[in-house]
Amino acid sequence: SRHSLPLSPPLFSGRIWGSSPERGDVVVFKFPPDPSLDYIKRVVGLPGDRIQMRDGELYINDQAVPRERIGQINNPDITEVSRPVDVYRETLPNGVSYETLDLSPNSVGDNTREFVVPEDHYFMMGDNRDNSTDSRFSVGFVPAENLVGRANIIFFSIAGGASPLEIWRWPTEVR
């Protein structure tokens, strides 16, 4: 199984989930249009929720999710030119908070229709809001049966301070 540690025998088939996903969980799921692909996104909508983006702000059940600008990072674009990108902290109704990136104001995903999450489905969004294939677009609602598991650790991050060649620094860069 490609979700196992190396050299471990496949002990389970299908998903392993101890409890239902909650808002703010980062989960791995099978891409609904092509279940051979695994995606990883954040759960923002639960069954029955109404989700909408208005002027770059996330609304859940007509309530704006608190969003605070906390700074900027330099982010290289596709031409490798570094440019400042705004970083925000969002706090979901259950108290889970996380950082999101806003690459540009008025991007295509900043204003959406209202999505009503069907029973046994979830609404997923990426934290890089302007550069994420998520439930606002081609991913759509994610059926519970497509969930693989919760992501609990970032093992290799391109945002980390260690180069892939600096193996000795990897343990201090795991987050």
Language-model regions, residue ranges each:
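Soluble "head" domains of membrane/secretory-pathway proteins
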Residues: 1-175
